[in-house]
């Protein structure tokens, strides 16, 4: 597909890499010449130095025959303007990143009036992810499928769980838990395990289950399941605002530390149920004096990654509460993984995942479309949910007879109100939603799960 990408910052760079690696013809537009040169030298993309809201620049980029137009500059208004002009000049699908909370209640109206196909608000998405984690604090990461009915949950395995030396196939009978272990991170590597795989303390385990079954499993392995009742947030930006709104609706006590007095006034007006503290969040004495040690959740949401990391390490030393750390830069995730920062949330990853998911779905003319896509375990594993629209080589055949690709696990089938952890005799049917976890990147369709070389 021909894709025009306006904005070559962190998100734009990640998208340029991902989309070009998937074989798309990508043209990047940015006003910064050095940034454009870096992208064209680093990835298989074309680059144009110019303003994405200029008709001349759009024409030079080939807007007339573009399939997808993506605007991820640092300005919401510019992103919307770019998409509006692109819609007028071409006939492509438009995707805009819009972050300002003042637009949050107007997104549907904006999409309809401007003709944008999709709007992504990474701060709102990050707040929802953090809210899920605070409702299920034993997990370090939670992703949802099947309209929220199925969850992919990650946790760190310690001696307290009593699973050291246990084979995965033993879990259902030993713990009477209907869950499926989908991936294990060990010693820097990632494994898609089979039933004979033996767990070890120190593993990062990702499993799939319904919310009810996940709750039961965590109780049986002595991980906390009670939602937090109070949260201590450092940083009063957009994520803190969205998160606090959701927490207050669920009767969670919220304290926000923000150093900017003007921003404190805004938050006090917008969040009358929260306690707003005007102070430098890096003031350790202040944090301790305000009861950080007794908080059930500590969430570091400043705009500086290094400050968030240090704050979380300090909180880890003094508090037993749930820890959540926001990180913007994508390039240091492998280093951060060794620091045990609790749950690390990357808003920019969420933006990329959503857009890549949308582009892959557009690429399918018919058949099985991607409904949901997550890249997990430091971007090394993809978890995808496909909707089955028509018969194919993957349907109507017992799963035990399907030749699946290596390092791929078919985890779940949802059929109407049924949620199935599939067995060898089960079959995929038209109308099903199918969830797979794989080390292979770039799957576009359910048929891509089959190892065509092994057939026949």
Regions found by a protein language model. Name each.
Residues 1-456:
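Cytosolic regulatory regions of ion transport systems
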């Amino acid at each position: 597909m021909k894709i025009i990408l306006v904005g070559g910052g962190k998100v734009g760079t990640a998208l340029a890499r991902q989309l070009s690696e998937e074989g798309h013809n990508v043209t990047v537009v940015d006003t910064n010449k050095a940034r454009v040169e870096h992208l064209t030298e680093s990835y298989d993309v074309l680059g144009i130095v110019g303003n994405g809201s200029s008709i001349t620049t759009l024409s030079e980029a080939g807007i007339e025959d573009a399939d997808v137009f993506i605007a991820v500059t640092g300005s919401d208004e510019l992103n919307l303007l770019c998409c509006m002009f692109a819609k007028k000049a071409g006939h492509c699908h438009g995707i805009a990143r819009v972050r300002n909370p003042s637009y949050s209640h107007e997104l549907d109206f904006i999409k309809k009036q401007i003709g944008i196909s999709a709007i992504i608000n990474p701060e709102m998405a990050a707040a929802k992810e953090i809210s899920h984690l605070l409702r299920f604090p034993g997990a370090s990461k939670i992703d949802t499928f099947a309209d929220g009915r199925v969850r992919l949950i990650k946790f760190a395995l310690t001696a307290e769980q009593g699973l050291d030396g246990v084979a995965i196939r033993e879990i259902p009978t030993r713990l009477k838990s209907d869950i499926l272990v989908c991936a294990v991170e060990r010693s820097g590597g990632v494994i898609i395990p089979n039933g004979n795989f033996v767990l070890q303390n120190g593993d990062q385990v990702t499993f799939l289950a319904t919310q009810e079954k996940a709750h039961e499993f965590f109780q049986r392995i002595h991980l906390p399941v009670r939602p937090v009742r109070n949260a201590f947030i450092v940083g009063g930006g957009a994520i803190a605002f969205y998160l606090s709104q959701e927490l207050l609706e669920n009767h969670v006590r919220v304290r926000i530390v923000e150093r900017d007095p003007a921003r404190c006034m805004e938050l006090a007006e917008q969040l009358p149920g929260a306690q707003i503290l005007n102070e430098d969040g890096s003031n350790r004495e202040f944090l301790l004096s305000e009861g950080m040690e007794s908080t059930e959740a500590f969430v570091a949401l400043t705009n500086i990654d290094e400050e968030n990391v240090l704050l979380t390490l300090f909180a880890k030393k003094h508090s037993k509460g749930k820890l959540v750390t926001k990180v913007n830069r994508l390039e240091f995730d492998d280093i951060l993984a060794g620091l045990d920062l609790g749950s690390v949330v990357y808003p920019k990853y969420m933006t990329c995942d959503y857009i890549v998911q949308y582009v892959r779905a557009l690429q399918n003319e018919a058949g099985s479309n991607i409904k949901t896509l997550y890249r997990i375990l430091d971007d090394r594993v993809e978890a995808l949910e496909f909707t089955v629209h028509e018969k194919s080589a993957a349907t109507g055949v017992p799963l035990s007879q399907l030749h699946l690709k290596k390092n791929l696990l078919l985890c779940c089938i949802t059929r109407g109100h049924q949620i199935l952890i599939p067995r060898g005799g089960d079959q995929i049917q038209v109308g099903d939603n199918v969830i797979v976890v794989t080390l292979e990147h770039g799957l576009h369709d359910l048929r891509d799960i089959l190892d065509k070389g092994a057939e026949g």
